[in-house]
Each structure stands twice: as C-alpha cells, then as structure tokens.
Amino acid sequence: MFLRRVHPVRLGHASQRSLTTTKSRNESTTTTVEAPQAAPSPPPDAFTEEFLRNQIKVTELQRVILGVGSSLAALVNPRRHDMIACLGETTGVPALDAIRRQMLASDEGRQILADRPRINTRTVDMAALKALPETSFGHQYVHFLEKHDITPDSRAEVRFMDDPELAYVMTRYREVHDLVHTVLGMPTNMLGEVAVKWVEALNTGLPMCYGGAVFGAQRQNYLRHYLPWALRMGRQVRPLMNVYWEKRWEQDMAELRQELNIEELVIN
C-alpha cells in the first residue's frame, strides 16, 4: 500500500485504506477507514455439491472423442445406457441451454430451476403415492414402476459437463423420463422406449433422443402405429421439462393429459 501526506479530510465509508495526515512538522496520525464487506457467496446447493464431487473435467478434444465413441457404442447396442448417458452429456449442451432458456421463460420452469427438486426413493414417498386414488398421476406412476420392476434410483449421475445448472437440467431430464413414460401410457419394451424417445426428441431437441429413436426401432408395427403417434405427440405436447411433476401427484391423470395436450395411443 502506498501512503501519502495530505491535508486533513472528512473520511467516508467508500474506501478501505490507511491515510497519513499531517498534524505538525514532527507528528502524524494514521486513520483506517473500513469499507463494507462484500456479501459472501451463497454456499452451493446440495445438487451442485454432489455434481462437483462426481464431475470429470475433459478437454474439447476428449469431449469429441467421448461423443464419437459413445455414439458408436450406442448404435451397436442401444441398451448401453451408460453410453447413451455419455453421448447426451458430450453432445447435448446447445439443446440443454435451449431447454434452460425455455424453462426460465415459464413460471413453473423457473421454480424448478430455483428449487432443483430430485426424484428418487429418498425424496419421494412412494408409499404415500401408492395410497392416492387409482386415477391420480402419483398412484399410476408407482404402479408403472412396480409393473415394470424399475426404480427411480437407477439414473446415471452427470459427470462430463462444466455448467452445474446445465448439469441439473440433464439430471432433471433423466429423472422425469419414467414420469413421461407414465403420462404417455408407454411401456418399457422396445416399442414403448422408442416412442418415448421420439416424443422427447421433438419436445426437447436433445440429440441422443433422436439417435435412440432412429436406431432403436426394430418392430414392424412401429411404422404403422407408434411412430405416427409419437411424431404427433412430440409436436403438440406442451414442453415437458417445464412441468413441476412433484406438484401434480394428486392430479387426475385424465386431467393432466388434457392439460399437457396428450392423446393416448389406441391400436385397433
């Protein structure tokens, strides 16, 4: 710090430095003025702390290599969920950023980004949902999980991303996937999974959804029934990432589908 001799002045609170003022030829005094402290940064939320613990930082070249390698592996074996997850993280940033902007433009979406809710057996009381009326969204979600013997705890953690908020958007996409299955009325077999992927592809723009939809279809009536329905739903359904699903558990399923503009697939 540099000190300089000046004439006595009235000191404000806008600076924090030591000023030496002249009292006499042989005497001086030093006055310290404290500036207001900057507000401390808020501590990271629980999701950000977890993400930073698991994050694997990669260079742009490594990201390209991971993207190409995971896409080839997913093409060879569409059931390699780890490769599909890696593909989404390494290629999905532009789409995730668009989803974030879309969420910020919606009251419900902004609330999701602020709260950062999680969907797993530690955060959702499955027994309470099961006790809801049979026509409720929450009850039918638990029925879907039990019928297909799956758990919301099986979703892969996001590792290869830089932005914690975009990492949350990706996590949210993964954790609501089974909720989308439920509200669309789609099973977890190949046809159901492919149909849901098409809806998600058109609804979110995530590139790995297009990949799963294109390369996963292996059954004949896919082109006849499932694909036309999925394409129509993908275009007409309201943005699914803007739905605060946890506040809809008690809502009647038929009412929720009508609100989201979802039509069930009917095969005669």
From Swiss-Prot:
Composition bias type Low complexity, residue spans: 20-38
Pfam families xrefs: Coq4 (PF05019)
BP-aspect Gene Ontology terms: ubiquinone biosynthetic process
Feature: compositional bias, Basic residues: 1-10
Annotated pathway: Cofactor biosynthesis; ubiquinone biosynthesis
Enzyme Commission code: 4.1.1.130
Catalytic activity: a 4-hydroxy-3-methoxy-5-(all-trans-polyprenyl)benzoate + H(+) = a 2-methoxy-6-(all-trans-polyprenyl)phenol + CO2
Residues holding Zn(2+): H177, D178, H181, E193
Family to which the UniProt record says this protein belongs: Belongs to the COQ4 family.
HAMAP family xrefs: Coq4
Name of the featured protein: Ubiquinone biosynthesis protein COQ4 homolog 1, mitochondrial
Source organism phylogeny: Eukaryota, Metazoa, Ecdysozoa, Arthropoda, Hexapoda
